[in-house]
């Protein structure tokens, strides 16, 4: 099976790339700008190019067809329109990575299926993903463009730790705070349910969709079946670090008032209780089951992080903001 990944080195796509490289019968090419290609398996063909330069990519891929094109780095409608122009008639399946944050907010029911309405007034990122889906489904209905839409939720991997909020430089600063006995912020009272999924589990399901005729024209989400409260998530991270984290609970409204850009990630995503019904992916990929519990996966992720000083990026601006918010919230904030 001849496959092209646009991207191929991120949290989600990197795990898929590594798993495919270990399997027979797959001829994988990744197309990206080459900035993160150091750990690509030797069997994977690499093309350096900017997918946003349509003429350049058309020339690079001239004469090539693919069984599957996997798009991991399209975020706005113009990018998927470009892909339709580039790949219509040249691929048998086009898999678009959307987002489970596209689902209705606030939810009318906490159990999410693929038929849950798509609407997110709180986050432009999610609205753009919805618009991308609409473009692709219109192309499927009108011209038969062979799209499959995949909606991940909160997926993590080696070195990436799933937190409710963190600074622009990643999760390390909050991990460091936990290790040093400093408090960290948990939005709300920490009792809302959330789902985190290890990238290796996600990859297994994604690979089962490759070339799958039953997935054409279909949206499907891929998540773990494990539901945890945010308190549990932080406590499990603390256990893996060998510490009891000091959690300070602060309302999402207050956090957004102090940092408006948190509205999307919180009200549009992580402050909602969500439970995913994964019946559809299990029907499309018989035998799939997310098998990595969070307490297992996060230990592996933290072990990787501790061995990589280049990922241990201090974020003094975020650190100071967290201290400032906790001071402002006291005594209205309560600690666990």
Where are the language model's segments positioned?
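Conserved beta-loop-beta element that borders a ligand/cofactor-binding pocket
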Residues: 134-164
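NAD(P)-cofactor binding segment of oxidoreductase domains
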Residues: 64-111, 127-138
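Glycine/proline-rich active-site loop of Rossmann-fold NAD(P)-dependent oxidoreductases
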Residues: 143, 157-173, 209-220, 243-244
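N-terminal Rossmann NAD(P)H-binding glycine-rich loop of SDR-like oxidoreductase domains
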Residues: 3-26
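A conserved pocket-lining segment of Rossmann-fold NAD(P)-dependent short-chain dehydrogenase/reductase
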Residues: 174-197
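Short-chain dehydrogenase/reductase
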Residues: 110-114, 119-134, 154, 164-172, ...
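Conserved Rossmann-fold cofactor-binding substructure of NAD(P)-dependent oxidoreductases
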Residues: 48-66, 78-81
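Mid/C-terminal beta-alpha module of Rossmann-like enzyme folds, strongest
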Residues: 208-267, 278, 283, 300, ...
């Amino acid at each position: 099976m001849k496959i092209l990944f646009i991207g191929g080195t991120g949290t989600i796509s990197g795990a898929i790339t590594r798993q495919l490289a270990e399997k027979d019968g797959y001829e994988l090419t990744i197309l990206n700008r080459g900035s993160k290609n150091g750990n690509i398996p030797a069997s994977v063909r690499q093309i350096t190019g900017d997918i946003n330069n349509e003429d350049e990519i058309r020339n690079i891929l001239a004469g090539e067809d693919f069984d599957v094109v996997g798009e991991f780095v399209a975020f706005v409608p113009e990018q998927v329109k470009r892909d339709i122009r580039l790949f219509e008639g040249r691929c048998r399946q086009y898999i678009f990575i959307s987002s489970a944050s596209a689902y209705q907010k606030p939810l009318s029911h906490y159990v999410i299926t693929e038929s849950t309405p798509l609407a997110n007034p709180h986050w432009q990122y999610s609205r753009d993903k919805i618009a991308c889906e609409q473009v692709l489904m219109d192309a499927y209905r009108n011209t038969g463009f062979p799209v499959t839409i995949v909606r991940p939720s909160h997926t993590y991997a080696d070195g990436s730790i799933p937190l409710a909020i963190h600074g622009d430089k990643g999760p390390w600063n909050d991990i460091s705070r936990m290790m040093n006995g400093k408090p960290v912020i948990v939005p709300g009272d920490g009792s809302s349910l959330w789902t985190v999924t290890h990238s290796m589990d996600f990859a297994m399901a994604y690979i089962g969709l490759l070339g799958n005729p039953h997935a054409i024209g279909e949206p499907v989400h891929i998540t773990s079946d494990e539901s945890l409260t945010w308190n549990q998530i932080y406590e499990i991270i603390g256990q893996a670090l060998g510490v009891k984290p000091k959690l300070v609970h602060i309302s999402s409204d207050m956090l957004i008032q102090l940092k408006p850009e948190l509205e999307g990630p919180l009200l549009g995503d992580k402050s909602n209780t969500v439970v995913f019904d994964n019946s559809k992916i299990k029907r499309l990929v018989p035998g799939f089951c997310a098998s990595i519990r969070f307490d297992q996966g996060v230990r592996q992720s933290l072990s990787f992080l501790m061995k990589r000083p280049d990922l241990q990026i201090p974020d003094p601006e975020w650190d100071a903001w967290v201290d400032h918010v906790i001071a402002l919230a006291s005594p209205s904030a309560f600690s666990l």
